[in-house]
């Protein structure tokens, strides 16, 4: 709303002092003119021309706001009778005119400032290059591939860890079996050692019995020899001189008895020897079989232990390879995260700058809104003053209604280079 109205021109051609009516007086009002040029593209009819004022006698001065709401005050024309306007009322109207002119000047300057700001904002918006978000899809694809590889590696590590645990459990089982077999072998070796001691004792007993039998045989031979010698000696002493026959029980055959005893002893010894040899052979065979089975089991356990050791070594090597691969992938992920973190920091900085600019724009908008509210308050206050002005005019209308003046008013609204104008002619204005 740009407006700068020219000064109000009141041109009284004549104001007589006779008792009759004075010559006609005209007041020309021009509104909605730019400063210095007096030309505008807007020609508006004053908003308050629709108000009908029934006046009898002299017509009051005309007020036209136009596009700039600038009233035309004919206060300097001496056409009123008996001092209708007092000095205080004239000063009040002059003060209101000054306030309205300053208000219109302020509105015009604010509109120019707003137009300048709008042009600057439009230029800035045209100069701003829209930020194009870079395409990070290939980086996202690379990250997804690396994440899939990491997940596969973790699954493989878990599987290898499970296999390693199973191998450790199998190794522990075989170790416990080996220890049990070793303890059983030691027990069998202890039994064999004890059986060897028993066999040696039996062999010693056998040799003792054989020596005892030999000594008994020698004693028997000595007894037989002594008996024969004694019998022969007695026979030689007696000779044929004495023949004594005794009716006694038959004598025992000592040789037969000794032979029987020897046979019994030899039979017992043979049975004992055979039983001992058979028992020893059975025990030895069992021990040999147990030893062979234990040796086979021990060899199998040793082979399994060697195989498990080789498997554990291979798994350890594979685990180290997987760990190195995992470390390299983690380093790659860390580098990627650092790169994207730096890019994200740059984007965040850009976002912060844009947010700061947006905050500044919002502050400017709030400030302009506050200024607009202040202007609205000023407008409301000025409207109140204008209403007061109208009240004063109405009071003057009521006071002038009794004046014996006849007034004619001709108005003309035309759209010309200098804007709308209205000509008021006051005729027969009496002093």
UniProtKB/Swiss-Prot annotation:
Site feature location: Stutter: 338
Full protein name: Keratin, type I cytoskeletal 40
Note: There are two types of cytoskeletal and microfibrillar keratin, I (acidic) and II (neutral to basic) (40-55 and 56-70 kDa, respectively).
Cellular compartments per GO CC: cytoskeleton; cytosol; intermediate filament
Gene Ontology molecular function: any one: structural molecule activity
Subunit structure: Heterotetramer of two type I and two type II keratins.
Region described as Tail: spans on this chain: 397-431
Family: Belongs to the intermediate filament family.
Alphabetized SMART domains for the sequence: Filament (SM01391)
Organism: Homo sapiens
